[in-house]
Curated annotation (Swiss-Prot):
Pfam family, one: Aldo_ket_red
EC id: 1.1.1.-, 1.1.1.346, 1.1.1.2
Name of the protein described by the UniProt record: Methylglyoxal reductase DkgB
List of residues binding NADP(+): 179-231
Lineage: Bacteria, Pseudomonadati, Pseudomonadota, Gammaproteobacteria, Enterobacterales
Disruption phenotype: The deletion mutant shows sensitivity to glyoxal.
């Protein structure tokens, strides 16, 4: 199954908040859900999915392996624990959340362990997140580009990450954008507002439509039904060449996610 272009993010949402967000999203027609071991919400997401009554085969569930679980003896057991929490026998996609700080666990070791998890049927696809070009090169050397379903990276109108995107595309690696709305900063942008007014759309719809138009998957999160519903409509918005050019000009390498001790040396 190809990675859905549109899904629900759950970063920073926990307990009843995430349960409500996931149940509402599934009611509205969302079918892809993105979580991670470090979000500490896999069990709540699993509960929400169970309560929603949506059949498992209709869903596309992504989780991510945390850095403490990257070694070959920990990766698969940690994924099995995630599956228990999510109340499922498999996930559709498992990502390496961040590369191992200071190369404590080699890219080769964790990518091969992740590929083994795929061979065991614990995950249908595998991929990476927050990987730079040198790290993607190592991942490809370890398991082959055909086994890397996506690189999930911070990507917004203010951080268009063109080098990484171009390199990934050249090697057949799909891009998933997180932080697409730049923590809401881009929603206040005058250029975005003008495009939104022109299309009778919301700023969020414009930005999400732009990202999907570039071929990226998006996973916006929201706790409000109104926004969840509105974001979904971004899939029907077509931007023209003028709009795309205006958004391309907003790129200013404004990176919002770069945790000290965790972030690699960015391209």
């Amino acid at each position: 199954m190809a990675i859905p272009a549109f899904g629900l993010g759950t970063f920073r949402l926990k307990d009843d908040v995430v349960i409500s967000s996931v149940i509402t999203a599934l009611e509205l027609g969302y079918r892809a859900i993105d979580t991670a071991q470090i979000y500490d919400n896999e069990a709540a997401v699993g509960q929400a999915i169970a309560e929603s009554g949506v059949p498992r085969h209709e869903l596309y569930i992504t989780t991510k392996i945390w850095i403490e679980n990257l070694s070959k003896d920990k990766l698969i057991p940690s994924l099995k624990e995630s599956l228990q929490k999510l109340r499922t026998d498999y996930v559709d996609l498992t990502l390496i959340h961040w590369p191992s700080p200071n190369d404590e666990v080699s890219v080769e070791e964790f990518m091969q362990a992740l590929l083994e998890a795929k061979k065991q049927g614990l995950t249908r696809e595998i991929g990476i997140s927050n990987f730079t070009i040198p790290l993607m090169e190592k991942a490809i050397a370890a398991v082959g580009a055909e086994n890397i379903a996506t690189n999930q990276i911070e990507l917004s109108p203010y951080l268009q990450n063109r080098k990484v995107v171009a390199w990934a595309k050249q090697h057949g690696i799909h891009i998933t954008s997180y932080m697409t709305l730049a923590y809401g900063k881009a929603l206040k942008d005058e250029v975005i507002a003008r495009i939104a007014a022109k299309h009778n759309a919301t700023p969020a719809q414009v930005i999400l439509a732009w990202a999907m138009g570039e071929g990226y998957s998006v996973i916006p999160s929201s706790t409000k039904r109104k926004n969840l519903e509105s974001n979904l409509k971004a899939q029907n918005l077509q931007l023209d060449a003028e709009d795309k050019k205006a958004i391309a000009a907003l790129d200013c390498n404004d990176r919002l996610v770069s945790p000290e001790g965790l972030a690699p040396e960015w391209d």
